[in-house]
Swiss-Prot record:
Its cofactor is Zn(2+). HAMAP family: NrdR. It comes from Shewanella baltica (strain OS155 / ATCC BAA-1091). A zinc finger (unnamed) spans 3-34. This is Transcriptional repressor NrdR. Belongs to the NrdR family.
Length: 149
């Protein structure tokens, strides 16, 4: 690790501890040249799979797009940002756990609907109506009937 003060290449670790619920390591370091101290954080780089769109094109996973879709679905509903962040985290964890380099967009959409169903039924119907491209009232009725089972 290079010293951010003098650019020396030799630093020593003085203290290490787990932070962020064990997902990161915080290290206190000291430069052996200038004796300045600084802190570094180390965490695993988790790569999200690429998304295969319905038209066959592929694009990188876009967390902002996922969050935007969820925020639109829960707009003006009694759902906290913590609940939204937890749901998004579950979706990302599930996608990473597949171990696949690419996942179909249908999988992402279905995971989103699962999370919305447990968060807020109205938000689920909102998202499903757009995602499944409902064309008439009967399709809304079918989705609502599915919720009542």
């Amino acid at each position: 690790m290079h010293c951010p003060f003098c650019s020396a290449t030799d630093t020593k670790v003085i203290d290490s501890r787990l932070v962020a619920e064990g997902h990161q390591v915080r290290r206190r370091r000291e430069c052996t040249e200038c004796h300045e101290r600084f802190t570094t954080f180390e965490g695993a780089e988790l790569v999200m799979p690429r998304v295969i769109k319905r038209d066959g094109s592929r694009q990188p996973f876009d967390e902002e797009k996922l969050q935007g879709g969820m925020l639109r679905a829960v707009e003006k509903r009694p759902v906290s940002m913590d609940e939204i962040e937890q749901a998004l985290s579950k979706i990302k964890s599930t996608l990473r756990a597949t171990g696949e380099r690419e996942v179909p967009s249908e999988m992402v959409g279905n995971l989103m609907m699962e999370q919305l169903m447990s968060l807020d039924k109205v938000a689920y119907i909102r998202f499903a109506s757009v995602y499944r491209a409902f064309e008439d009232v009967s399709e809304f009725g079918e989705a609502i009937a599915k919720l009542q089972k």
